[in-house]
Amino acid sequence: MAQAVKIRAEREPAMFYRRIEVKLGVTPLRSDRDLARLVDARLPLATVESLSSHGMSDEEIYSFIVPRRTLVHRKSRREALTHDESDRAVRIARITSLAEEVFGDDAKAGRWLRKAKVRFEGRSPLEMLRTETGARLVEEMLLQLDYGFAA
C-alpha cells in the first residue's frame, strides 16, 4: 500500500501528510516511516476525537477502530490505543486523505467512501478499510480514478 500512496503523494507530499496530521491530531509527518513510528508508539486516545471532528461518525469509529465499550474502558484508565487500533486509525486517515486529494473536496470524498460499489461486491470503500487488503483495493481504485483509468 505504501508504494501506491507514495506515487500519488509525490505531487504534493507535504499537503498529503498534512491532511493525515490533522485527521490524527499528531505532530508533523513527512513520510510513511513517520506513520509507522506513530503506530509503533501507539496513538493517544485524542486521535479518536480528532478523527471524529474530521468527519468520522462515532459509529464508524466504534466499528472500524475501537469498540465503544473498549474505548470507554481505555478512557477511564487513560490508556493509548493498541498497536492494531493505531494501525486502523492510520489506515483510515491515509485513505480518507487520499480520497480528499483525488476528489478535491472533503464532502465528495466522504460520500464516495460511504457509497456501496459494485467493484467491492456492494460494500462501501470505508467498509473495505477493515483490512489492509481491502484498503489496498480502495487505494488502487482511487489512484485509477485520479489518473482516469476507472469509472
Language-model segments: which ranges?
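Non-transmembrane "mature" sequence context
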Residues: 1-151
